[in-house]
Amino acid sequence: MFADKPTLQGDRVTLRPVGPEYADDLFELVTDPEVRRLTGSHGEFDREASRHWYATRSQHADRLDLAIIANGAFVGEIVLNELDEGNLACSMRIALIGARAFGKGYGTEAIDLLLRHAFTTTRLHRIGLEVFAFNDRARHVYKKAGFVEEGVQRDALLWDGEWHDAITMSVLRPEWRPLHGSLT
């Protein structure tokens, strides 16, 4: 379903297929302490393993990994993964690199571009995600993009000795409306 790896152009951001040219940027992203907290990532990351991982993303037709570029610089990644073709569903995740990306509308526009692509060029019916309850900024952006809270996974993350809930959200094709412009 995601064999085509498009470049998607918005007003402020461009989404480009992840490849080896973004390996160092992506390694910075996955090792950033705030990104690790917001995504609940406990594991360690090896630079060479990360380089190989990102160099092979274009070979997978069951996922779409896109770098978020603003003003010519890498500011994050957005991904459709965990494809369930039988149910026309997948998951979405997004991560932005701190101060150079937060609060500038890059995430909102990236999500809008990705949802527009997914719902107008594929047969997907449902796109879901999980977000930790403490991440109010992300929850607000997801709701603005059309995601609806479906449930709570209690005590889903143990971080610095404290338990945190995860919120399950999704957007369905019939409910989705683009934030900017029309579907035509």
Question: Where are the language model's segments positioned?
Answer:
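Conserved GNAT acetyl-CoA-binding A-motif
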Residues: 120-130
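Conserved acetyl-CoA-binding loop-helix of GNAT-fold acetyltransferases
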Residues: 97, 103-117, 139-144
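Conserved active-site tyrosine of GNAT-family acetyltransferases
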Residues: 142, 147, 169
